[in-house]
Amino acid sequence: MPNEMRKIVFTEGELQAALVNYALRTNKKLPNATINNILVEAKEGVTATIVYMRDGTEEAKSVEFTPNDVAAALILYCSTRQIPLPRDAKKVVIPIEDSVGMIIKIDTHENS
């Protein structure tokens, strides 16, 4: 039986919304400042760093998200937007340009 694979690509704005929502729900402290950009890096999984605008003479602040944080944020984002994700499927986060995507692989082989 064939396997099913889906790819969901998130815009930079969707990634930002996912990370901020996740941070608020998990009590991760975020600065009260304007977001400048999000850096996405592939190192032992996909990490994301929200970089904030400099506020006067202060250095730019940033908040890092681990690969598990990024995956959880995207799954939560899909759940709150009613984007279906199969519970038992393997989910892998990949970097795509200035944002991320999620590959969902559904193994339809039954153990006989």
Question: Which residues fall in each region the model found?
Answer:
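Intrinsically disordered, low-complexity linear regions
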Residues: 1-112
